[in-house]
Amino acid sequence: MKLYKINQGIIIEASEKFYLSNTKSWDAYINQDNLFEVISTDVQSLTEISWNYEGILAPIENQEIWASGVTYMRSREARMEESQDSGGADFYAKVYEAERPELFFKSTAARCVGTGEKVRIRKDSKWNVPEPELTLFITSSGKIVGYTIGNDMSSRDIEGENPLYLPQAKSYDKAAAIGPCLYVPKDVINPDTQISIEILRNGNLMFSGNISINRIKRKLADLAHYLFREMSFPNGAFLMTGTGIVPDNDFTLLSGDVVNITIEGIGTLSNEVE
């Protein structure tokens, strides 16, 4: 099942039918450990409506967005390449093998955008890429109950100059996009699920790639555990789980590019670059 956030409330998609939830609070509704069961019960008493996916907002209200780094081999390679001259390559090699994952703060809801909105590239950066990522929704008790698509916009030249510049390379206005919905399955997401991306420039395909989430180095539950180990999230939290798709080093995003990220079972997150 899927939940869509709109100005009028919450749209539930179940068995290819749509329902407008009686619940108005996004925070309260999604932050339930038994969310799948709650939705299943709710749709039994709701009236089916006609809806054509208009007015979709980012599926976030008062949550924070965090992110994981170097969780796929391709990400490890790319980080090592961009930081070779600064002497930081070893840090990425070590964190890929370490027990403790790399976690960093990505965005507040106010800085985040949803599908159909524009993401940004930093004005002081010349090498920027999108990073397509499966994104977890974790309740305040630490349970993974849903998934969405994340675009972790990144300034590779800034992070490559010095690993300590990562917060500037990763966190700025409109550097995070999530959506289009919160996917709430009965069981954990299928490990064979495919993530794919295409980048269009003036209608022409500039880059595409895909990867299965079973290629991730770490268990999703372990990433969630480390995030919640010493922090509380009263409304739950979103956690991007890292990327396994990185364009070649000669590619950078330009204003006007369109980034489409698709994850099987969830949908497509589409954003133009500002």
Which positions does each model-derived feature cover?
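Generic N-terminal segment detector
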Residues: 1-73, 270-274
